[in-house]
């Protein structure tokens, strides 16, 4: 009978991750993101996923003066740099560094094949860094889940409130003017 042994692991820092990119260890062909010190493979974006991200980006740009970043990194020091599908961030240039938690007002993840990962890994990660609101677009389930008001203790991080909306309209709980017609969102999707 064999027993699993917990081996010590080295968590990569955001600096380590950036050096791996700069030196060519990681390239544009490597579809990974840094989550809690680990390099996590990202599923390639299929046409449906890409369409939902583009549609959401287009709609959001008409509703806010915030900068709408599509599939671009946000830095969550010291060991995470996820690439959310959409990040609504403070409207300024990010020439020297990717947005930090204090710059991010809302994140949207489009989950066509990544629902479990997004809900069990990314939502708590975003809560830990006090991202005010997160939406998960559940493509297969035909719903949008909204999480807001991060609640962080020494033991865990989660959102104090959540709701799941399948029809009609979902409205941001933290950013005035952000609304999404789910009937329009699901038009043309399978």
Give, region by region, the residue ranges found by the protein language model.
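Gly/Pro/Ser/Thr-rich low-complexity, intrinsically disordered segments predominantly at protein N-termini
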Residues: 1-190
């Amino acid at each position: 009978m064999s027993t699993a042994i917990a081996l010590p692991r080295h968590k990569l820092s955001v600096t380590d991750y950036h050096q791996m990119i700069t030196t060519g260890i990681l390239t544009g062909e490597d579809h990974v993101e840094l989550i809690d010190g680990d390099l996590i493979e990202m599923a390639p974006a299929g046409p449906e996923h890409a369409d939902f991200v583009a549609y959401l980006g287009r709609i959001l740009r008409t509703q806010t003066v915030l900068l709408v970043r599509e599939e671009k990194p946000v830095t969550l020091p010291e060991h995470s740099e996820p690439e959310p599908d959409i990040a609504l961030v403070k409207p300024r240039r990010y020439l020297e560094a990717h947005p930090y938690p204090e710059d991010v007002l809302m994140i949207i993840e489009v989950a066509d094949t990544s629902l479990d990962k997004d809900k069990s890994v990314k939502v708590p990660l975003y809560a830990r860094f006090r991202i005010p609101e997160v939406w998960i677009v559940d493509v297969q389930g035909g719903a949008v889940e909204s999480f807001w008001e991060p609640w962080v203790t020494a033991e865990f991080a989660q959102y104090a409130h959540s709701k799941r909306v399948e029809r009609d309209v979902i409205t941001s709980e933290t950013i005035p003017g952000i609304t999404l017609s789910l009937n329009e969102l699901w038009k043309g999707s399978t």
